[in-house]
Amino acid sequence: MARKTPLNRIRNIGIAAHIDAGKTTTSERILFYTGVSHKIGEVHDGAATMDWMEQEKERGITITSAATTCFWKDHQINLIDTPGHVDFTIEVERSMRVLDGAVSVFCSVGGVQPQSETVWRQANKYGVPRIVFVNKMDRIGANFYNVENQIKQRLKANPVPINIPIGAEDTFIGVIDLVQMKAIVWNNETMGAKYDVEEIPSDLLERAKEYREKLVEAIAEQDEALMEKYLGGEELSVEEIKKGIKIGCLNMSLVPMLCGSSFKNKGVQTLLDAVIDYLPAPTEVVDIKGIDPKTEEEVFVKSSDDGEFAGLAFKIMTDPFVGQLTFVRVYRGKLESGSYVYNSTKDKKERVGRLLKMHSNKREDIKEVYAGEICAFVGLKDTLTGDTLCDEKNAVVLERMEFPEPVIHIAVEPKTKADQEKMGVALGKLAEEDPSFRVMTQEETGQTLIGGMGELHLEIIVDRLKREFKVEAEIGQPQVAFRETIRSSVSKEHKYAKQSGGRGQYGHVFIKLEPKEPGSGYEFVNEISGGVIPKEYIPAVDKGIQEAMQNGVLAGYPVVDFKVTLYDGSYHDVDSSEMAFKIAGSMAFKEASRAANPVLLEPMMKVEVEVPEEYMGDVIGDLNRRRGQINSMDDRLGLKIVNAFVPLVEMFGYSTDLRSATQGRGTYSMEFDHYGEVPSNIAKEIVEKRKG
């Protein structure tokens, strides 16, 4: 089966935006006008084709990047829907990785919002060229020019309008195309499928000329030939203007900007035209970097049909009918269904059972997949997100994706014994799908802990356990692993002697207990001389202490960072045994601990908060209230960075509090750093609570 669409007519694009900018509606309209959907799904009634997971239908927010294929004017557009909520930025990063271009959707009223800043930074990080679509022009308070200024100021970008609105709010009827210098007015009767091209209304002619001049000036800078023509006062042709916009868009020195109202079916066709005119084909983006696994040298993979197959797995989903789907972006060569691929990241071969082209939630079996395509592979067992699939003889490992450490953990308990096993399997599957979600067992409590990127992230995981895997689980309060240690040195003796007819028990030890440096652990030193305790009983003393230290004297938490020296003792020829010395060691340690000024330790997290300057005071005040120690403050990309150590126990609910304190514009990350001493008043509360 030969390739249907040449590589230069393929566009892999993502639609990225802040929650509520109208991103899903825009994707829907694209599918509608390109002839995929017949009835438009609305997010408001939960029928959008892109939003195909059940919870998305309820929450009205898009969670997973469904990859959908559609066609427009002889071009194939592979549309990757990205989530717009801060807890799902990992999904956005993951899709940015495989996009060639993006459409950034902004609300004409809300403008540049917090998540849009995060998503914009991610697109910069991966070098993704983009066009801006200012949506919801029909809403009260719509202001296209306001959004233009915010993009300049907040995102430090160079937006260049290529169309401007005719009217706003309920008088918004169409746009002025600044390239053709014509008015485009949509026809309400045909649900926006038809539009008329007219002369520019006289009251908007001045503004249109002013913005056309700005556009021509911006693109003349992109190319010497255009600059000469412009400076010579010659008129640039439509083709030359388009060429200039494309050069600037691809080198990211300018961002073409359009407007419309997806909900009212206006402006979607002009957006699709801009996607194929200005966003890059796979052949127009920088070659992707990789490593040759044999030589460890850097290699570059060019997007082309020639050469051996190479692709990147960027998303794993469990489909109730087909099983596991692995979404792959193909960078080079082609692959037939039923053939074998080599996973160079894992050094394993796997067979691809079927190849599926996804149309939001419908699927089409295809025989082979070519460079530049995005396709779901069925039948891969060992491949995870971020793995490279390629030809074994021409192996390459494409750039790995980086996944952040979870910032929140909660305990999950299955409601019934029957759920226990199902829960383990289900959590394993969810962790395969989502690399930012982790599962572990807490040694001290034996509970299963799940960790993720935020409270909403974990809520959705628990929700999916119930819906997709039919596992009922209770979630606990977030738990903190405290520790105990000692602050002073003490010597103690303990004699364990039991004589009550028959063979007795006898063990007698003298130990010295001393504090050690934080993080240095446990040390046992044997200073017995002259055989006062026989050699074979020494390990039993050590073992007794190690068992006792799992249960500290303050509140039953493990004791850390101390040294025990066994320096004297005595034994009985008949009654001494390993058991007796183990008990003697354990009792001596407990008595010594009580006298050695025991203290409680808690995990201290290294926290980095990134906020706009106006919220800095509030954020620092809040960290101080949480017993944080501020270490440093820096500037980065017009934002303030606060670095601090904060006790983990004080960080629960922080993402929600930070979001409301900074109107969602603050972001933070945290990781475990060290154990620190709990202040005595707080330690007292913890001990009393623990002893109940």
From Swiss-Prot:
GO terms for molecular function: GTP binding; GTPase activity; translation elongation factor activity. Catalyzes the GTP-dependent ribosomal translocation step during translation elongation. During this step, the ribosome changes from the pre-translocational (PRE) to the post-translocational (POST) state as the newly formed A-site-bound peptidyl-tRNA and P-site-bound deacylated tRNA move to the P and E sites, respectively. Catalyzes the coordinated movement of the two tRNA molecules, the mRNA and conformational changes in the ribosome. GO terms for biological process: ribosome disassembly. Keywords: Cytoplasm, Elongation factor, GTP-binding, Nucleotide-binding, Protein biosynthesis. It comes from the Bacteria. InterPro entries: EFG_II, EFG_III, EFG_III/V, EFG_IV, EFG_V, EFG_V-like, EFTu-like_2, G_TR_CS. Its main location: cytoplasm. Residues 8-283 form the tr-type G domain. GTP binds at residues 17-24, 81-85, 135-138. SUPFAM superfamilies: EF-G C-terminal domain-like (SSF54980), P-loop containing nucleoside triphosphate hydrolases (SSF52540), Ribosomal protein S5 domain 2-like (SSF54211), Translation proteins (SSF50447). It is found in: Cytoplasm. Gene3D superfamilies: 3.30.230.10, 3.30.70.240, Elongation Factor G (Translational Gtpase), domain 3, P-loop containing nucleotide triphosphate hydrolases, Translation factors. It comes from Helicobacter acinonychis (strain Sheeba). HAMAP family: EF_G_EF_2_B. NCBIfam families: EF-G, PRK12740.1-3, PRK12740.1-5, small_GTP. This is Elongation factor G. Pfam families: EFG_C, EFG_III, EFG_IV, GTP_EFTU, GTP_EFTU_D2. Belongs to the TRAFAC class translation factor GTPase superfamily. Classic translation factor GTPase family. EF-G/EF-2 subfamily. GO terms for cellular component: cytoplasm. The keyword Nucleotide-binding applies.
